[in-house]
């Protein structure tokens, strides 16, 4: 999503029943387009796994697991919360992005436009103009999940490849691979599509005593 390093995700995710029922016969790109076009708000849960290995035939291993929940309202408003094994929150109100690390009692603040762009967060929380920032390609079907591969058009992004998977129109997961060969896997569950969400749900107020760093 924005920056998947240290303790950050980049951070990063649902449409009317009739539209999503048709997704069972649709290709992955068509399902993705339906997701970004028709899902204006959503909330759900996620599990994030950091995967190592795979080079030169070495076995894959899970190096770390975290979990939490998310809420979003297109375009550009979201809350992405890590709850286990540590607490961290990424919040965006449509203009600014706030990254709050509870253990460090620190808030990092930056303009959202500079953070979204060609990041994986743009797929889940941005506008529906994915072709502007990504090259889309069908990624095939594995274990019943249809995958879309998205390659950022910009050359200065942290991620060289992003994949997003759907099962019969339902959002299932994302795979993020950075320029160093590290892979992050996200699986989604308990997704509620198009709930009514007030603007106040995305308003972030730094906790009392927290250090605020503006970038």
UniProtKB/Swiss-Prot annotation:
Q: Which SUPFAM superfamilies match?
A: Prokaryotic lipoproteins and lipoprotein localization factors (SSF89392)
Q: Which GO terms describe its biological process?
A: lipoprotein localization to outer membrane; lipoprotein transport
Which first-to-last residue range defines the signal peptide? 1-24
Annotated GO CC locations: periplasmic space
Localization terms from the record: Periplasm
Instruction: Tell me which UniProt keywords the record has, alphabetically.
Output: Chaperone, Periplasm, Protein transport, Signal, Transport
What InterPro entries would the database entry show? LolA/LolB/LppX, OM_lipoprot_carrier_LolA-like, OM_lipoprot_carrier_LolA_Pbac
Q: Does the keyword Transport apply?
A: yes
Functional description taken from the UniProt entry: Participates in the translocation of lipoproteins from the inner membrane to the outer membrane. Only forms a complex with a lipoprotein if the residue after the N-terminal Cys is not an aspartate (The Asp acts as a targeting signal to indicate that the lipoprotein should stay in the inner membrane).
Q: How does it assemble?
A: Monomer.
UniProt lists the family membership as follows: Belongs to the LolA family.
Tell me what this protein is called.
Outer-membrane lipoprotein carrier protein
Q: What is the lineage of its organism?
A: Bacteria, Pseudomonadati, Pseudomonadota, Betaproteobacteria, Burkholderiales
């Amino acid at each position: 999503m924005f920056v998947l390093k240290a303790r950050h995700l980049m951070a990063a995710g649902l449409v009317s029943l009739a539209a999503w029922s048709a997704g069972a016969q649709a290709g992955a790109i068509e399902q993705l387009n339906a997701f970004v076009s028709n899902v204006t708000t959503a909330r759900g849960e996620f599990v994030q796994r950091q995967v190592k290995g795979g080079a030169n035939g070495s076995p894959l291993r899970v190096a770390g697991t975290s979990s939490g929940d998310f809420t979003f309202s297109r375009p550009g408003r979201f809350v992405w919360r890590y709850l286990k094994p540590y607490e961290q929150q990424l919040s965006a109100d449509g203009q600014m992005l706030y990254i709050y690390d509870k253990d460090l009692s620190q808030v990092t603040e930056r303009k959202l436009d500079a953070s979204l762009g060609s990041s994986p967060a743009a797929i889940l929380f941005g506008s529906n103009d994915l072709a502007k920032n990504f090259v889309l390609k069908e990624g095939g079907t594995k274990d019943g999940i249809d995958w879309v591969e998205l390659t950022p058009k910009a050359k200065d992004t942290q991620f060289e490849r992003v994949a997003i998977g759907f099962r019969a129109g339902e959002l299932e997961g994302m795979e993020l691979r950075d320029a160093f060969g590290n892979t992050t896997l996200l699986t989604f569950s308990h997704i509620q599509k198009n709930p009514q969400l007030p603007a106040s749900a995305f308003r972030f107020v730094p906790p009392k005593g927290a250090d605020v760093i503006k970038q």
